[in-house]
Amino acid sequence: MNRHISEILEKYLGRIPSLTEYHTLKSQYKNIHRVNIFNKDIFISLIKKNKKKFFSDIDTSVSEIKKLVFDYFTKQEQTYSIGKLYTIIELQTILVTTYTDILGVLTTKGPDIFSSNVQYNTSSMQKIASDALNSMNIATISDKVMGRHNVSSLVCNVNSLMEEYLRRHNKSCICYGSYSLHLLNPEIKYGDIDILQTNSRTFLIDLAFLIKFITGYNVILLKVPYLKNYMVLKDQNDSHIIDSFNIRQETMQHIPKVLIDNIYIVDPTIQLLSMLKMLSQIDRLEDLAKNPDKLTIRFATLLEYVRNKYGIILNGNSNNMPMPATIDIKKRIITVDTKYYNFAYDKCYVYLDENSLSSDILSLNADDAVDFENVSNSAFLVNDKTLYTYFSNTVLLSGNDKIHEISSRGISAHILIYQALMKHDISIPLTDIVNSLIGRNKQPIYEIIPRDKKTGKHGIIDIEKDIITH
């Protein structure tokens, strides 16, 4: 038994380690030593500053914060399960090595904010957006309440923190969705702030601890199997606080961005295409039916941005958009004719099952597929003048084996997302797809082809119960 390691473990556990504890935990002695020497007083002062700046409405005393912190950092002394000890060590290590740089820094003076003038008056676009969405308002309203609509009372506090976080960490974290559009158009209301970042797990763990030490709430982190690299933070009532997609730094570098008030947002062009794509999902059409006004102002803002950026003339001349597409329902593959545009391929095979795409890419023996993770929700491969990709939403039919225009437009938008992420010029097809929204009549839904079913178990990080499952 190494005496130095044994002393580190004894100090950490508050007891002489058993032989089992020694031999299973000795590989962690460096991390344990970091926890042992961690200055809790400085840490508590950072928590106090975070509370004052972002959670001032929470009624927690300094003594309560101290107790919660010291209780957690001595929790191992009353824990004898090796599995739970490993969990405590892992979470404590993340906290002591990352908290200051990730969340503690938010309380210090930040760089000057360079105010942006990238704001849009969307009044001229309201009618076009409203008419376009009205032509797509064809779903029956569902009474089902989606999990994303159960919002925690802490969202406003976390939003305040996130605004500062996005400014301080704008190389590793960017936003999209309603908050990003609020920066373009202050009339847009937003709930939580949607983010993409390169260190999502670490950030959410640090945030979970901050909330725990300020509120005493037993918040948990959930990893959802059907959304890649996605984690959501929930409060003790199972209500949504914030979620985040993790992406690689390589993907982050590919994403077109716009800087507004020191915050990077996903280029609204990508967001418009993503919205057109998402409208093929039946759940989103149900949301549209429930609250068309909410989507109209967002849609109008995106259209106005794209019109300005690309100089698009809105005349209803859509040329070849949406691109012609046929579906093989049995194989669940859609073939899109892309030859009308200056792409590096003449057709596109759009798979509705991701495993089938992966299998076919493997059989092609090609190693140059690209994957933009949650930005595109698909890998892409160009091989022999054909683009191979996967579409993650439902596909609507307007007749027997006939793809509904909403879905064919969504699939065309998906292809344009690939073109944009690869830094290709999309001005002509983008102009056409925007004009394809004008002067359309409602088409009823004949059939809904279901989306790919993802299997797997939820992963969980529960600080209170010392559980980490992957």
From Swiss-Prot:
It is an enzyme of class 2 (transferase). It catalyses: RNA(n) + ATP = RNA(n)-3'-adenine ribonucleotide + diphosphate. One of its GO terms (molecular function) is poly(A) RNA polymerase activity. Its EC number is 2.7.7.19. GO terms for biological process: mRNA processing. Keywords: ATP-binding, mRNA processing, Nucleotide-binding, Transcription, Transferase. Pfam families: Pox_polyA_pol, Pox_polyA_pol_C, Pox_polyA_pol_N. InterPro entries: PolyA_pol_cat_Poxvir, PolyA_pol_cat_sf, PolyA_pol_nucTrfase_Poxvir, PolyA_pol_nucTrfase_sf_Poxvir, Poxvirus_polyA_pol_cat_C, Poxvirus_polyA_pol_cat_N, Poxvirus_polyA_pol_cat_N_sf. Coiled coil: none annotated. It comes from the Viruses. The active site is at 192, 194. Heterodimer of a large (catalytic) subunit and a small (regulatory) subunit. Polymerase that creates the 3'-poly(A) tail of mRNA's. Belongs to the poxviridae poly(A) polymerase catalytic subunit family. This is Poly(A) polymerase catalytic subunit.
